A protein has these predicted regions:
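Hydrophobic-face positions in mid-chain alpha helices that act as interaction patches
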Residues: 95, 233-234, 248, 256-389, ...
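Bacterial Sec-dependent N-terminal signal peptides
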Residues: 1-31
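Short coil/turn linking the two alpha-helices of tandem helical-hairpin repeats
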Residues: 159-166, 210, 249-253, 406-408
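Membrane-proximal, proline-rich intrinsically disordered regions
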Residues: 22-73, 304, 462
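Long, intrinsically disordered, low-complexity segments
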Residues: 194, 429-462
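Inward-facing hydrophobic residues that define packing positions of alpha-helical scaffold repeats
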Residues: 50, 119-122, 192, 199, ...
Length: 462
């Protein structure tokens, strides 16, 4: 692959389409964002507060746009178009690893500040649930499980960004109480222990999702909306995926086996199938993630009604937007290896006129709703609910290919081949860890995950 070689000190602490009534419900929950005491008197108030958490996760500073783009800038996925703009300048500094510039610290500071605001809001909800004195709540376990899962998730993301890889050195503050007092920093090891404690409790509380989250997905329950759209909630399978991530990243004795166990539980549940047959083609890959939570592969995503506007300024401006650092990253030099349909994630947009398309040139289109960009592209309308993906099942297939490579190479190859065949590539007879790395690099463009893989693997340069 062609990538700009830049020395990186990895140990640096870096700062849908559903019935109208259902869409109306999703729109209304998208607005729940302010926690007030008056909310915590009935289930409607609690659920409004819960939806407020997801609104924050989908904010522009977090998974709505900036956080994945920042991570991709660090991972050298991106290059800048003809002109730098105020919008792009901070990311440009990150691509050059100027972490201490004012623009860089502003971007990192936005994640840190809003991340801890989210954690504070979670703790506020948990405090009220723990002291609940009103009519019993039918979904108390779901509420608490989702809160604990979100708290662990946000702390783990902050730890991966800002904490030391050395378990005995400074991590981040792990805040598990609501209040104005200052929480001291924990070591990285202590942070992992607290993340796992929250995730294990969440796992127990969310076991109802074994029946609520099925494949094919259940119809919307109009009488109990909170148990619908479970892939848009912190659900049991998202917690399993996070447990797998955390164990693999910590990498203490026995952790790889634990990561493998949880990854297998998700993949073998068959609730998040990869495309097969006629679905393995350009049309599917143009539509599957274009501003939507992947309908089948999405384990957890955030509903967000303004996905297009949040991403258009980053990737579709004529001047000053980000381009792919390697436009040929999906190219297979040997035709016998098949056609990687993910190549449709970097393409010339179908604009209103050929002249406009030519001006734009090759663009990062994986997350762009082509039917909003040009209403004539109706056949390219996305599949699924409008929003952002946070966890998708390919990560678990590739994790299994990595963790089983030495102990169970036949199984590792099976999971790897299932994955690459779903992308249009022909199966392999043997694989290496570098093959898995390459597929992860190809798969997680624009999702902010590849940088974390590099950091975990302690890669000295990219």
């Amino acid at each position: 692959k062609t990538m700009k070689i830049i020395k990186v000190n990895i140990l640096l602490c870096l700062l849908a389409l559903v019935l109208g009534s259902c869409e109306d419900f999703l729109e209304s929950r998208d607005k729940g964002q302010v926690l007030e005491e008056k909310l915590f008197v009935n289930k409607e108030g609690v659920e409004e507060a819960m939806y407020g958490l997801y609104y924050t996760i989908g904010a522009g500073e977090l998974w709505g746009a900036q956080l994945p783009t920042i991570m991709d800038a660090l991972a050298q996925y991106l290059t800048l178009g003809t002109y730098s703009t105020e919008n792009s300048g901070g990311f440009e500094e990150l691509m050059l690893h100027n972490h201490e510039s004012e623009r860089s610290t502003t971007l990192f500071g936005g994640i840190w500040t809003l991340g801890y605001k989210l954690i504070s809001d979670v703790n506020k909800i948990l405090e009220n649930l723990d002291s609940w004195g009103y009519k019993p709540l039918k979904h108390m376990d779901l509420y608490r499980g989702e809160c604990l899962g979100i708290r662990a998730f946000m702390h783990f993301e902050l730890l991966r960004m800002y904490g030391s890889c050395n378990l005995s050195k400074r991590g981040i503050p792990y805040v598990n109480n609501y209040g104005m007092w200052v929480t001291p920093f924990s070591t990285t090891r202590e942070c992992y222990d607290k993340v796992l404690k929250d995730l294990n409790e969440a796992h127990t509380l969310l076991l109802e999702d074994e029946n609520l989250l099925t494949y094919p997905r259940k119809p919307v329950n109009a009488y109990d909306q909170f148990t619908s759209y479970r892939e848009l909630h912190m659900n049991l399978y998202a917690v399993k995926a996070l447990l797998a991530r955390v164990y693999l990243t910590r990498n203490e004795p026995g952790d790889v086996d634990s990561a493998t166990m949880y990854a297998r539980q998700i993949v073998d549940s068959k609730k998040f199938p990869l495309p097969t047959g006629a679905n393995v083609g350009p049309d599917h890959f143009i539509r599957m993630m274009s501003g939507t939570v992947a309908q089948d592969e999405g384990i957890w995503g955030i509903y967000k009604s303004d996905t297009y506007s949040a991403l258009q300024s980053l990737f579709l401006l004529e001047k000053g937007s980000f381009l792919a650092a390697d436009e040929k990253m999906y190219e297979e030099l040997d035709p016998a290896r098949g056609t990687d349909h993910r190549s449709n994630w970097i393409r010339v947009p179908s604009a209103s006129t050929p002249e406009v398309s030519e001006k734009l040139g090759m663009r990062l289109m994986k997350l762009i709703n082509a039917s909003v960009f040009n209403t004539a592209n109706k056949e390219q309308a996305p599949i699924g609910y409008s929003g952002s993906n946070i966890i998708r099942v390919p990560e678990l297939y590739l994790m299994l290919a990595e963790t089983l490579l030495e102990k169970e190479p036949t199984e590792a190859l099976r999971y790897y081949n299932e994955f690459i065949s779903s992308r249009g590539l022909n199966t392999e007879e043997s694989i290496t860890k570098e093959d898995v790395d390459k597929q992860f690099w190809r798969e997680y463009l624009q999702e902010g995950q590849y940088w974390f893989r590099l950091r975990r693997r302690q890669v000295p340069e990219i």
